[in-house]
């Protein structure tokens, strides 16, 4: 409230009052008390804390984002990634893969017969500030190029050990992974430094009897559970199905699987000499667009800079299929005008030479032939029929189909499918028949879930197609595989493939 004295008539010098001016003055006593009180109250001075991005691997939510799968599916993620790595390693070593899988009550172990992993590569996997992959930036028919799969696997044990059913976190959580290769056992413990708030990794080595190939054992926390059931037991059927599915799409694979000491699968390769596009085969310039070639070139420039070397444009060109000869290299260099130029200089220092990269790509394509789809690798009717019969299929109902082509973007592909009825569907009117078996995958890897959920412009997927022919619930066996120089996924978990209209399902 204001006193009447606060309202004073306004006057001009030498004149009488003409209007009333209201001057509101706050109570001086209250104002002084307010200032005194403000000074006596404690104040918070905010500071900027540093939070490591590496913690993205150390929480349940973030690791689910990294893998693209919920924690209930992590046993399947571990198996898929380690199987893909083992198969790729065997093909790089140019040996027919012999892989064994053993699932215990608290561990998943996979062993291959490839060339093994050198210590430097293992140490780079433990560096969470970088992403290391021999398939990163390449465009080629490969099982995967995530680049951080092993990093996520190392962290899974810790995250599952950290999260408790009672809602509390285990401060002493640790994830344990063992890599045995080239006579050395690498024991890796993944934990967290709670002061620096970043991963703390302990790496110790001891002798190992494993001298051929690599054996990776992922320890699983005993308390990791789903609805009161151990996580590995929860995933048992999915794990066994995933293991079996790899045998469908890899004719050169000899495979053995053991569950709690009991063998559940043993498959001998139908064709140990089976040929497909291998990781060591040169990629084709026809598979890259301008953005992808720029990324691939940048990766080379960055690696050369780290290794303090200079690669020429000619050396870069020589890596591509059909461009290894000096005559064709000279034609490309002359057309682009980059003879005797280093790749780093051609790429650009202050600004990316996009026009030059586009011109180089056009010239490389002009002087090399596109890859025929058949060179990607055909699984074939004989192998798929053998797997079909082993799964209990009826030989007379077996059908095989193969479609191949090249997309509008120049990407070759082959789609193979095998279909037929299980024996149980032909007896007793299908009563007590087994459930439908659906095996799907791309580039000789297997999908954790069906990745063919949308075909071309129709938007309908494999499930809808099976429903149309009334095969959605009957005891049918259906396998679909896509081989392509470039597979585009709709999600990080690689659970849904984006198919262009070039690769629609057939009308018949």
What are these regions (language model features)?
Residues 3-14, 18-22, 28-32, 39-47, ...:
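GHKL-type ATPase core
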């Amino acid at each position: 409230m204001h006193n009447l004295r606060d309202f004073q008539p306004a006057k001009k010098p030498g004149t009488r009052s003409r209007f009333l001016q209201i001057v509101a003055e706050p109570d001086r006593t209250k104002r002084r008390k307010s200032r005194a009180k403000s000074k006596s109250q404690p104040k918070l001075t905010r500071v900027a804390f540093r939070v490591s991005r590496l913690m993205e691997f150390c929480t349940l939510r973030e690791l689910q984002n990294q893998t693209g799968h919920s924690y209930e599916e992590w046993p399947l993620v571990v198996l898929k990634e380690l199987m893909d790595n083992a198969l790729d390693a065997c093909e790089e070593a140019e040996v027919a893969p012999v892989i064994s899988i053993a699932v215990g009550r608290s561990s998943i172990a996979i062993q291959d017969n490839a060339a093994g992993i050198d210590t430097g590569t293992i140490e780079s996997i433990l560096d969470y500030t970088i992403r290391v992959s021999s398939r990163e930036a390449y465009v080629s028919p490969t099982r995967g190029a995530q680049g951080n799969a092993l990093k996520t696997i190392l962290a899974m044990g810790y995250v599952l050990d950290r999260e408790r059913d009672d809602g509390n976190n285990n401060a002493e959580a640790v994830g344990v992974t063992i890599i045995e290769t080239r006579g050395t056992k690498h024991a890796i413990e993944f934990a967290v430094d709670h002061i620096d708030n970043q991963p703390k990794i302990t790496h110790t080595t001891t002798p190992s009897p494993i001298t051929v190939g690599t054996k990776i054992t992922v320890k699983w926390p005993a308390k990791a559970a789903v609805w009161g059931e151990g996580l590995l037991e929860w995933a048992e059927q999915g794990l066994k199905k995933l293991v079996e599915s790899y045998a469908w799409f890899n004719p050169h694979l000899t495979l053995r699987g053991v569950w709690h000491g009991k063998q559940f699968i043993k498959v001998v390769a139908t064709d140990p000499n089976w040929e497909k596009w291998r990781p060591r085969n040169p990629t084709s310039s026809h598979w890259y667009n301008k953005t992808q070639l720029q990324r691939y070139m940048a990766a080379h420039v960055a690696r050369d800079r780290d290794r303090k070397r200079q690669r020429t444009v000619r050396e870069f060109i020589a890596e591509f299929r059909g461009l290894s000869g000096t005559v064709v290299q000279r034609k490309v260099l002359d057309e682009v005008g980059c003879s005797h130029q280093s790749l780093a200089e051609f790429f650009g220092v202050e600004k990316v030479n996009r026009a030059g990269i586009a011109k180089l790509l056009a010239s490389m394509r002009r002087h090399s032939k596109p890859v025929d789809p058949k060179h990607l690798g055909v699984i074939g009717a004989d192998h798929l029929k053998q797997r079909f019969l082993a799964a209990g299929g009826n030989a007379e109902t077996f059908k095989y189909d193969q479609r191949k082509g090249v997309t509008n973007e120049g990407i070759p592909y082959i789609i193979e499918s095998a279909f037929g009825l299980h024996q149980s569907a032909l007896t007793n009117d299908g009563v007590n028949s087994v459930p439908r078996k659906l095996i799907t995958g791309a580039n000789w890897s297997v999908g954790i879930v069906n990745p063919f959920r949308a075909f071309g412009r129709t938007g309908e997927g494999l499930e809808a197609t099976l429903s149309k022919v009334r095969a959605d619930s009957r005891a049918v066996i259906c396998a679909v595989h896509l081989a392509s120089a470039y597979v585009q996924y709709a999600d990080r978990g690689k659970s849904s493939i984006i198919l262009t209209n070039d690769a629609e399902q057939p009308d018949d």
